């Protein structure tokens, strides 16, 4: 006898949703679909984050949803839609302009504002990225390890990863116009 849900109870690392799509490949109610990403399509693998550590909170509540279900299987969505905000699947697919952008600094919470449910935060799920290594500053917290698509690892703050535009320049795992305004 095997349980129906064979997922690990929780994991400490997460992928970049612009490369790792969620396990939802077609939903009639959404404007866009997830697509599998071949590593050969990445424009700048040495400058594109593949994975990072989750923010460790009390009883891992930072990676739980409001119903207290652990969502550590979800990748981090680094971008927001120009018109849809964090609801990236409902961003229109048409037009020649970039439809996604990096969140503003104001969407990255200071350490004192971090709490439960960061994995489902309405501003950006980037707030669920770890900040528990040395470095960083008193306001935003410490650093995290980031694995890049070419295999190297770098330690930096979540804010630095956003300011340096290291999560990519396309929402590779999203159908339609997936350009990011960098």
Predicted regions and their residues:
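Short, well-structured segments within or immediately adjacent to enzyme catalytic domains
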Residues: 1-182
